């Protein structure tokens, strides 16, 4: 029995397929992610294969995260210094974005095409990966999460609001901040080529690679 088990393990290693893993910042087109419209590169016959894990209203998420902090901040402030609508304040400001998006994909249209055995394997890996994303990243409040299978290659869109609590600096004690949200997760950043965001994306790719490995896919790192 032990001999058979060792043999099987060698067979799995022998047939490990090598695939690239990509993680990138997306444009954050919520209408595209939700398929409010069908772009040219989308196959309308496969739209029903898409998986929607989360699809919340961004304004409601802002109320959930920041309304109490706005109330605390406004205490004792002159009316012209008070924050009336934090969502609009961020939307109209230049320091922070309302939300950020990250996209993850295994392989490409040549080796992990939608509808193929390999493509279905990519779907399984991405599905397993996303299940613990929020738990792993508590300061990145996910409000939109979609696994698309109606384009060339299965890929995952994750839309989130990065925030920090117990902030001691200027402004509200709970506020939008990508830099501080990632710092609280342990990513300190180094220079402009080694930012908190780059460190975090690389870490998430490693998490994805570990799950892929359990499914017989080895991360092919290029460059």
Question: Whereabouts are the PLM-identified features?
Answer:
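N-terminal nicking endonuclease/strand-transfer module with a His-rich metal-binding environment
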Residues: 1-223
């Amino acid at each position: 029995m032990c001999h058979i088990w060792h043999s099987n393990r060698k067979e799995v290693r022998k047939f490990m397929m090598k695939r690239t893993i990509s993680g990138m910042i997306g444009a954050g087109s919520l209408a595209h992610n939700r398929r409010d419209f069908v772009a040219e590169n989308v196959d309308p016959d496969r739209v029903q294969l898409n998986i929607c894990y989360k699809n919340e209203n961004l304004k409601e998420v802002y109320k959930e995260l920041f309304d109490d902090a706005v109330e605390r901040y406004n205490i004792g402030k002159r009316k012209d210094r008070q924050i009336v609508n934090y969502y609009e304040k961020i939307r109209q400001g230049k320091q922070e974005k309302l939300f950020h998006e990250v996209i993850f994909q295994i392989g490409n249209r040549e080796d992990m095409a939608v509808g193929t055995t390999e493509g279905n394997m990519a779907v399984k890996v991405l599905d397993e990966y996303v299940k613990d994303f929020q738990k792993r990243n508590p300061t990145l409040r996910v409000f939109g999460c979609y696994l698309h299978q109606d384009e060339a290659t299965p890929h995952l869109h994750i839309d989130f609001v990065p925030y920090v609590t117990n902030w001691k600096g200027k402004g509200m004690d709970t506020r939008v901040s990508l830099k501080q949200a990632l710092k609280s997760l342990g990513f300190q950043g180094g220079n402009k080529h080694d930012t908190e965001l780059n460190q975090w994306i690389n870490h998430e790719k490693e998490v994805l690679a570990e799950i892929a490995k359990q499914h017989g896919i080895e991360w092919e790192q290029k460059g």
